[in-house]
Amino acid sequence: MKIISGNSNKTLSNKISKFLKSKLINSSIKKFSDGEIYIEINENIRGNSIFIIQSISSPANDNLMELLLCIDALKRSSAKNITAVIPYFGYARQDRKVAPRTSISAKLVSNLITKAGADRVVTVDLHAGQIQGFFDIPVDNLFSTPIFARHAKKKIKSKNIICVAPDVGGTERARALGKALNVGLAIVDKRRPKPGQSQVMNVIGNVKDKTCIIVDDIIDSGGTIINAAKALKTRGAKEVYVYITHGVLSGEAVEKIKKSVIKNLVITDTIDNQDKIKKAKNIEVLPISGLMGEAIKRISNSTSVSDLFK
């Protein structure tokens, strides 16, 4: 087993490498003057099982192309098999046609990764579980729920807790954390007038005098989560904590969160955004390297990955 890192999140790659006690493959990733990406593997990998770690985060197009070219380079270097470890699977939010003439980018990206030569994919908290079905190769979708549950049990002292889905689509995710914490569930009913905007219509469930934990997979502009937190406070919630796997945090998201009613936002390090959040006192980052490293180890040893979540 050998590991190679793309440029999207070298900090996470180094943590996973340290966890597995395996050095990263020596490689060169450069750009030509016109922006074309050039990748070269600088050591012999013939006959090895290779795990490439690369998030499809901002700049999403460059990082996706880097992933595809790296898979191709590994394939042409006679790797035995290639596992694409994609902590944050970008383009996953376009998983279906929401208008008559739109693309389904999640399916296209799945096709590209497979066609490039990947034999397996490992990712964390896919935006929609059915994206696994877009691939014709095995996909291991890891869950951050155990990490969040351990943190919440230590961090939140209240005995009157309820988990909240910020929209109907996130119900299963919130229910999973609620089950781990042995608490109930509420749902924020919202509509989205246009991308990046959300409007709360109703809150299903009693949140009065309760400590609310909003659970979601992605926080981008922050609008959905901030509006949900406001709605909960308006309906009598005592305080609002937020647990989200992927901190995209576009534009002014961090500033908006700092000024919001959110007591604490907890994200993982699937996306490298330390520079964005270093001055935000109410944003905390949990490491995902242990979970991902253990999954890689189990795949390499042909043992169960799903047992991690039992």
Language model feature labels by segment:
Residues M1-K310:
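PRPP-associated nucleotide enzymes
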